[in-house]
Every structure is written in structure tokens, then in C-alpha cells.
């Protein structure tokens, strides 16, 4: 671990999806193409994106998060014990509603055999003497916030009556993914965390979490586990 950024300039790692990829994902959702057909389009568009990153002189390369429908939820869905469901209402951004997916707990959370490890291996294949493959991931706090988003918290508490056990399993799941990524050759992991912005507005946080997790509790969790 280093406290200094390895490069003078850098990127977040998420890029706008090309129309060809968006069309392929929509066709897959409608059952018009198979998963392998979608993967082929993803592979081809990621390869094009990486060439653009290299041409721009970037020293880290990512897949642009092209294999995801959301920047964070797809990673959560890759954990064992977590399932994808659709809500009646999606996220709200300045009056605009996004898609309605979320993540709920259905069993003991585990990071074993996470699909993002295979995703990383594809990007790793494009590394050269000037570039390093990066894996972007949503932070553990983002997962905790999602599991207590709206009525999700009732489901979470039913599976995990003891909050400490939930926190320990989330931490263990992330450590498993980190180990597997390391063994796959990953030396650059970026954690993205939007919960910091949620904390700026107490009213928003309380409305979103419906009192399930208070800001005081989050602070206590941070002190205990960081």
C-alpha cells in the first residue's frame, strides 16, 4: 500500500457505454441474444476502449465498467448470499429516476468465485510495460448502505439479526475478492464510495435508510472496522 498516487494524472475508470453495447444489453434483456453474444460485444468494445486509453497516454487501464448495468450493483450481485430484485422506484437524481434494481440478502454473504475476477483477467491481458490494469469496485460502505436502503433493511435484519456478524461477513467477502484479484495479477484496486455524499444531508440519509442505520452508528462501525 502507498500513500502517494503512482501517476501524475489519472482517471476514475468508468466510461460512457457505446451505443453498440447498450443495444446488445437491451437485446439480451429481451431474450433476443445469448449471454455469450453479449460477452463478445463487451470484449470487443472493451478492447477498443483500452486502445483509446493507451493512445491518450494513460498509465492505468480499465474495462470502463462496460460489463455492468450499474456502477455498483453488479458487483454486489456477484457475492454469494446476495440477490438482484427490482423495486417500485429507482434512485432519484435531481428529479430524474434511474433504473430500479437493488441488492438484498438471501443467505450468508461470501466472496467466493466472484465473476469480477474473470472480468479483470481479460483487462490484465492488455497490460504492457507502460500500463497497469486496474479493478474498480464499490466500497464496503456502499454495500452496507444498499442493504439498508428503504425496506431492504428488514430483509437484512431477518437474515442477520446480529449486525456485527453482517459486518464481519461483508469484510470477509471483500477480503476474498481482494485475494482472488491479487492471485489473478491485480496490483491496483480502486474503491468507489458515494456514501460520503449521503452523510452531508442528514435528512436525506434518514429518509433513505428509514432509521435502520444512523450516522452515529456508521461512525461507530468505521472506528471499529477501519
Locations of the language-model features?
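Domain-level signal for soluble alpha/beta catalytic cores
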Residues: 1-225
Amino acid at each position: 500500500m502507498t500513500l502517494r498516487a503512482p501517476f501524475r494524472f489519472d482517471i476514475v475508470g468508468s466510461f460512457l457505454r457505446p451505443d453498440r453495447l447498450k443495444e446488445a444489453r437491451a437485446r439480451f434483456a429481451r431474450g433476443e441474444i445469448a449471454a455469450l453474444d453479449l460477452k463478445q460485444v463487451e470484449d470487443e468494445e472493451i478492447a477498443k476502449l483500452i486502445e483509446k486509453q493507451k493512445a491518450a497516454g494513460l498509465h492505468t487501464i480499465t474495462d470502463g465498467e462496460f460489463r455492468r448495468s450499474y456502477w455498483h450493483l453488479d458487483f454486489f450481485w456477484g457475492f454469494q448470499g446476495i440477490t438482484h430484485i427490482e423495486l417500485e422506484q429507482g434512485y432519484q437524481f435531481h428529479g430524474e429516476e434511474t433504473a430500479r434494481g437493488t441488492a438484498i440478502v438471501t443467505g450468508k454473504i461470501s466472496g467466493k468465485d466472484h465473476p469480477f475476477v474473470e472480468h479483470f483477467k481479460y483487462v490484465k491481458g492488455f497490460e504492457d510495460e507502460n500500463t497497469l490494469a486496474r479493478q474498480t469496485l464499490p466500497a464496503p460502505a456502499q454495500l452496507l448502505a444498499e442493504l439498508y436502503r428503504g425496506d431492504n433493511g428488514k430483509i437484512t435484519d431477518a437474515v442477520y439479526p446480529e449486525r456485527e456478524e453482517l459486518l464481519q461477513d461483508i469484510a470477509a467477502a471483500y477480503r476474498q475478492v481482494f485475494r482472488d484479484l491479487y492471485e489473478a495479477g491485480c496490483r491496483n484496486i480502486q474503491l468507489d464510495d458515494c456514501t460520503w455524499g449521503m452523510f452531508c444531508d442528514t435528512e436525506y440519509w434518514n429518509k433513505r435508510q428509514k432509521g435502520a442505520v444512523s450516522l452515529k452508528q456508521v461512525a461507530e462501525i468505521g472506528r471499529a472496522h477501519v
